[in-house]
Amino acid sequence: VFHPEVDFDDRIDHKLRAEDLPIRVPSDKYERNIRAIRLLHQLEDENRLATESEQKLLADYSGWGGLSDRFDENHSDYEELKTILNPEEYTPARESTLTAFYTPPVVIEAMYKALENMGFSRGNILEPSCGVGNFIGFLPESMSDSKVYGVELDSLSGRMAQQLYQKQNITVGGFEETLFPDSFFDVAIGNVP
């Protein structure tokens, strides 16, 4: 459990709306990512969970897909990236520029609608490659009694998800390293790369 010292009732799960995730131009995406990373590092330095208003800033993080030019040493943002991202964050971020694209809200909502049509309303939900947790943030009210378990290999994205979805169980690491019991999940949902 992330920050076990914090009571469950004092935790906040961020709720996403489609308008919270517009398509952004690269410069805007970059600036929002940097703000979110600075805030994440501050929260970690202060050893605390994000407030509701801070979660809105963290939710602006959208990964590095489409931003490969920012990692070019001739780009004006290169030095800032090298300064803000520690070595354990920098290399995976650079390597993800061709693969880190998060699922659009319309797809997430359609997948949940399909689950509703199949009669699913509550249970243990697995999101095996959760990124920053967009599937968790779009969990419909009709499924709000469910418990979501997210797994994310990318440390930066997984740590963002832990701050955004404080009531859920987010594992930062490889799925093969998890210790979930057999037959524990009622449904798995996601858009694994």
Question: Where do the protein language model's features map onto the residues?
Answer:
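Class I S-adenosyl-L-methionine-dependent methyltransferase catalytic core
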Residues: 2-193
